[in-house]
Amino acid sequence: MNNSVTLQASASNSQLQRARALPMPSRDAMLQRDLSVQQFWDTHRGLLRDAWREWEEQSQSDLPEINETCLDQHLREAVADAWLDPSKEAAVRALWHEEVPGVYSCQFFDPEKIASLRNYFDSAADAGIPLRPPYGIALNRGGAMLDVRSEGYLAAPGFQAFYQQLLDTYMRPIARLLFPEVFGYDTQTFGFSIHYQADTDASLRPHTDASAATLNINMNLPDEAFTGSEVDFINTDSGQVKRTVFKPGVAMIHRGSVPHAAQPITSGSRANLVLWLYGDRMQIPRFTDEERLVDAKHRWTVPTEISDDFAPF
């Protein structure tokens, strides 16, 4: 190996080692939005990005493969057909079942492939690189920020490619299909993982999301049972509450304006992947519009707008 290659490898390894040596901000400091927390993430953003790249390169042979084959075959095939011929999008629509007004469910991931996704997240959590947990309404100890707009996000290039594919190929056209008014308010993305554990994470009070559309996917393994942690969706017109339980690999997609709440988890653990879409500078539709006409071929496109740096939390 020549000297330049040796120096490059040494510098790269040093980045990973330096990232692992960083002291994470305390839980209290994060919850209190202490200025030092923001300074920590801003100061080390480049270092952490490089460390994740190096970690992925070093761990490549041990990391599970995550790609489109992790998705449910029926959904994958219907979406592929719609991208080739948008007039076939009805087959995608037929896979989504309305649970309550404005809330739809579908088998999103293949339950037998969830283990690969979970193993990847577990490997990332054990990487020793500072990873920012979600702390919007509450701090979730086992979760991670996933989008490049978020500080402390999971910056491994292979994961980022998969994450972007979920948003561009699947979530955005599906949201446009189910919620016509979302079109044009879906140029920006946001995502995080959460992991609720009994006796650790409290319930999540009723709230709405700062999104045009939210996709929430159950990442539990088929034999990974839990009790409690049901999600309540609130019909603002009738006041009725629909309590739902996610099965492994099932996704719920809804407008961000739909109020919902998570009940306390009483045993076991629950893992979820949450993805948001919204417009530039965090704009969201003011009203629902079931009758808005959008040509199918426009639904199955990827926005050309540049990603901004606005983040909900």
Task: Please annotate each region the language model reported.
Residues 1-101, 297-313:
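Fe(II)/2-oxoglutarate
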Residues 1-14, 169-171, 175-179, 190:
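Charged interaction patches that mediate protein-protein contacts
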Residues 60-73, 107-125, 164-168, 205, ...:
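Short charge-dense sequence patches
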Residues 83-181:
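Non-heme Fe(II)/2-oxoglutarate
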Residues 146-158, 198-208, 246, 303-307:
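Short, charged low-complexity intrinsically disordered segments located at boundaries
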Residues 172-297:
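Catalytic core of non-heme Fe(II) oxygenases with the double-stranded beta-helix
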